[in-house]
Swiss-Prot record:
One of its GO terms (cellular component) is plasma membrane. GO terms for molecular function: G protein-coupled receptor activity; olfactory receptor activity. This is Olfactory receptor 6T1. It comes from the Eukaryota. Disulfide bonds join 97-189. Odorant receptor. It is found in: Cell membrane. The keyword Protein biosynthesis does not apply. The lineage of its organism: Eukaryota, Metazoa, Chordata, Craniata, Vertebrata. It is a multi-pass membrane protein. It comes from Homo sapiens. Belongs to the G-protein coupled receptor 1 family. Residues 47-54, 121-139, 218-237, 293-323 are cytoplasmic. PROSITE patterns: G_PROTEIN_RECEP_F1_1, G_PROTEIN_RECEP_F1_2. Glycans are attached at residue 5.
């Protein structure tokens, strides 16, 4: 098409939602429950690590920031999906599309940086315990978190500017649940080679770079744990990073799967499912992983809910009845 005849598209239509009203209702209900549970889990971790003095240590400082980040990530995606299903209005303006895209990839990129920082924290705690408090003091922790957010903010700025400058002259239907990059790129009537190259290089660098740092950290942790003289010390060392390692495996596994599938241009349905797993299901699972595998968080949660006092009262009543 002659560039002079281009008519810039001002809005897009999300086509990834089912047409059946029953399925839409079930999807809406599932998304709403998932979002409420996810937000509640994230807020619990944030509040508990803030008010409980025993959790005022470096590991839970990073966990609090990680939970806040994932809460923002699901908030960028899920509420818009709920509004689309509830109102039946599948349109999204070009500006809103670019903003949602930037926020989604900014938060997702920051997620990888924070995971790498948390891996470094676990490495220093287990492999350099005598120097840990000096190397990972409160000031350093704050700087690392701030650097992660700033790096994520700048990392996706260039691809977003390139995306916003692309011409879109129709069609305007995005075959996805939310605004994702690859379905939108297919709609552009301009040259997308530079954007694809930049996006590929940056995404590969952040994914493999953070994964390499995380892998090296846990390789050193594993070597240190195996050298521990007793089984009790090995269990204690491993328990301090088991939940984080589980989250690392889930996030990197789903992200690499999604990255490979997107690159190979496989089934659209499979890509949609992988996207939902990466940005909705994974944040839902993470609070349960951190609480179920962490004794301190469990104890703080029980005390916040008043369970120890309730247990003590019940034992007192049983004792008095026996007398």
């Amino acid at each position: 098409m002659n560039p002079e005849n281009w008519t810039q598209v001002t809005s897009f239509v999300l086509l990834g939602f089912p047409s059946s009203h029953l399925i839409q209702f079930l999807v809406f209900l599932g998304l709403m429950v998932t979002y409420i549970v996810t937000a509640t889990g994230k807020l619990l971790i944030i509040v508990l690590s803030w008010i409980d003095q025993r959790l005022h240590i470096q590991m839970y400082f990073f966990l609090r920031n990680f939970s806040f980040l994932e809460l923002l990530l699901v908030t960028v995606v899920v509420p818009k999906m709920l509004v689309v299903i509830l109102t039946g209005d599948h349109t999204i303006s070009f500006v809103s599309c670019i903003i949602q895209s930037y926020l989604y990839f900014f938060l997702g990129t920051t997620d990888f940086f924070l995971l790498a920082v948390m891996s470094l924290d676990r490495y220093l705690a287990i492999c350099r315990p005598l120097r840990y408090e000096t190397l990972m003091n409160g000031h350093v922790c704050s700087q690392l978190v701030l650097a992660s957010w700033l790096a994520g903010f700048l990392w996706v700025l260039c691809p977003t500017v390139l995306m916003a400058s692309l011409p879109f002259c129709g069609p305007n239907g995005i075959d996805h649940f939310f605004r994702d990059s690859w379905p939108l790129l297919r709609l552009s009537c301009g040259d997308t080679h530079l954007l694809k190259l930049v996006a590929f290089m940056l995404s590969t660098l952040v994914l493999l770079g953070s994964l390499a740092l995380t892998s090296v950290s846990y390789a050193c942790i594993l070597a240190t744990v195996l050298r521990a003289p007793t089984a009790a010390e090995r269990r204690k060392a491993f328990s301090t990073c088991a939940s984080h390692l589980t989250v690392v495996v889930i996030i990197y596994g789903s992200s690499i799967f999604l990255y490979i599938r997107m690159s190979e241009a496989q089934s659209k349905l499979l890509n949609k499912g992988a996207s939902v797993l990466s940005c909705i299901i994974t944040p839902l699972l993470n609070p349960f992983i951190f609480t179920l595998r962490n004794d301190k968080v469990q104890q703080a949660l029980r005390e916040a809910l008043g369970w120890p006092r309730l247990t003590a009262v019940m034992k007192l009543r049983v004792t008095s009845q026996r007398k």
